[in-house]
Amino acid sequence: MKRRYFGTDGIRGQSNVFPMTPDLAMRVGIAAGTIFRRGNHRHRVVIGKDTRLSGYMLENAMVAGFTAAGLDAFILGPIPTPAVAMLTRSLRCDIGVMISASHNPYEDNGIKLFGPDGYKLSDDIEAEIEDLLEKDLSTQLAKSDDIGRAKRVDGVHDRYIEHAKRTLPRDVTLQGLRIAIDCANGAAYKVAPAVLWELGADVVTIGNEPNGTNINLNCGSTSPVALQKKVDEVRADIGIALDGDADRVIIVDENGSIVDGDQLMAVIAESWAESQQLRGNGIVATVMSNLGLERFLDERGMALARTKVGDRYVVEHMRQHNYNVGGEQSGHIVLSDYGTTGDGLVAALQILAAVKRTGRTVSEVCRRFEPVPQLLRNVRISGGKPLEDIQVQKAIADAEAELAKTGRLVIRPSGTEPLIRVMAEGDDRAQIERIVNELIGTISNVRSAA
């Protein structure tokens, strides 16, 4: 069944445009509250957000919805997504909410939901919520004496700071490291610099002056140019770029070069394997991760399990098969020893631990493999199903046959935008570019004719 509201990472869209309206946010609160209002105990929801202007509006709407459904609401204010997941468990809540559109510009916003175990909701539970959203929710409202209360919770940032600090091995200190960190004017603008400073680093911070409209604006993990300049300017040993809700990270080495999530997973996998912390004798990544990562792991006797795109699917596979390292090329790194979802800061701390323990530079530590040439292009669509067209399917089959022994092809609809993503990788860059361009042309022609 096609889903109307939920994508690969919750509900997302332009603020004050369906589905990201206060009316729907309130209805999501009622619907989700109804589903998790089970048992005889007093029910609770924890609600966090990033720094977007629309966060105030959506926060109040969701508080109204959940309290109307009979849940007490704990309001956290701006805080990283992994902190919401952690606090959902530690505060014994029935459900957790993060209001954020992650790396998107401020005009967008989104709703991510976590179960009482701190994990993102399954497709089945999201389908239950969608089913309720199509019904009359007035029958689900709490009785007058059962309406929930709302309370703003103080001190939650300190809880997350202590949690993050505990993930750095006790024999490691960050003294002697100059770290430049870009907080994307987002949810981690207070906590991330504090963690690094308390662990002994010399910290230089940018992207820590949110005003409601500058989240991810020329800063953060999707726009690391400002961080590259700052690393060069202050001669930092490393740069750390988070995104708006701090669930992903990109590293800049001392030379200003960017290190993506694939390289970071390689570092952590190798380091944890050496210390016998790695479980599953490998890691979990998505179909978008570079073939070079797969070859790197294979050469060291480790496996790479692939899932469809979305960190929630990475986490599901990790839980099912007992892996403790997983992630995405984009910088979502999930370390299940320390959390239930991607955590950019905690992942960065594992890289810093490897740097300190080896005594090598960040560039030496983080360049674990040579990436295979990879090209990703998007085709914007306004409707229809071009991937079901016979002409497109034949072009895809021909491309897959050509790449069978030397590369990979991934074509998929975006889960968050009206796009079709075309990615190919292989040892021959010219071949990859030709294949992608031909497929883009075929899909575009079918789209235009539709």
From Swiss-Prot:
Q: Which domain of life is it from?
A: Bacteria
Note on how the cofactor is bound: Binds 1 Mg(2+) ion per subunit.
Q: Which family does it belong to?
A: Belongs to the phosphohexose mutase family.
Report the top EC class in one word: isomerase
* Residue positions of the active site: 102
Catalytic reaction annotation: alpha-D-glucosamine 1-phosphate = D-glucosamine 6-phosphate
Q: Which cofactor does it need?
A: Mg(2+)
Query: Mind telling me what this protein is named?
Result: Phosphoglucosamine mutase
Where does this protein come from, organism-wise?
Answer: Rhizobium etli (strain CIAT 652)
List the taxonomic lineage: Bacteria, Pseudomonadati, Pseudomonadota, Alphaproteobacteria, Hyphomicrobiales
- Write the record's keywords in alphabetical order, separated by commas: Isomerase, Magnesium, Metal-binding, Phosphoprotein
* Task of the protein: Catalyzes the conversion of glucosamine-6-phosphate to glucosamine-1-phosphate.
